[in-house]
């Protein structure tokens, strides 16, 4: 078994794990075939990380192909890892990691009694990213405005948020 050594990989893995362990998110991802019941009243997802990782939640890659059936998934990607710069000055010992967190949902499983599935998931993702103290580094994470992805087939909806964190190069 390999040990993740670099901070960017450890941090992306931590973000994905925290999101998969959230009960609201994992139920919305796991019970993708349930549209006409209150998804939050359904049984807990057993072993959410083992159940969702590389099936519904993808780390450092986008969804490999469009789904053959109605489905929903999420991805956490390292977008950039570079020396921190501010006001035109680059800092030698501080790095800035940029992550993309996205949700893609087929229209057939989109509407639920709890709201639009991808919107419910994305709202929860943003609340976690803004408030989870385990995700702080040098200061708090900075979130960009959420954007809709238009380069997907018409029958899907997708949203992406970019998150930046500063860290010491040897963290």
Task: Locate the predicted segments by residue.
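Small/polar-rich, solvent-exposed N-terminal microdomains that initiate assembly or binding
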Residues: 1-87
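A short, hydrophobic secondary-structure junction motif
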Residues: 61-64, 102-107, 126-131
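Acidic-leaning, charged glycine-interspersed low-complexity segments
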Residues: 71-74, 116-171
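Short, solvent-exposed beta-strand/turn "edge" segments of beta-rich domains on protein surfaces
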Residues: 86-94, 151-156
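A small/polar active-site loop signature that marks catalytic segments
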Residues: 97
């Amino acid at each position: 078994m390999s040990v993740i050594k670099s901070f960017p990989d450890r941090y992306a893995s931590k973000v994905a794990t925290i999101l998969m362990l959230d009960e609201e998110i994992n139920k919305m991802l796991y019970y993708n075939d349930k549209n006409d019941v209150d998804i939050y009243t359904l049984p807990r997802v057993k072993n959410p990380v083992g159940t969702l990782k590389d099936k519904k939640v993808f780390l450092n890659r986008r969804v490999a192909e469009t789904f053959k059936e109605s489905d929903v998934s999420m991805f956490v990607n390292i977008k950039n890892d570079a020396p921190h710069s501010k006001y035109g000055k680059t800092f030698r010992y501080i790095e800035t990691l940029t992550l993309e967190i996205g949700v893609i949902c087929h229209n057939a499983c989109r509407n639920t009694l709890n709201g639009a599935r991808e919107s419910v998931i994305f709202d929860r993702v943003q609340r976690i990213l803004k408030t989870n103290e385990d995700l702080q580094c040098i200061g708090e994470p900075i979130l960009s405005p959420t954007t809709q992805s238009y380069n997907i087939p018409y029958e899907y909806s997708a949203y992406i948020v970019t998150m930046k964190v500063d860290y010491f190069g040897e963290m």
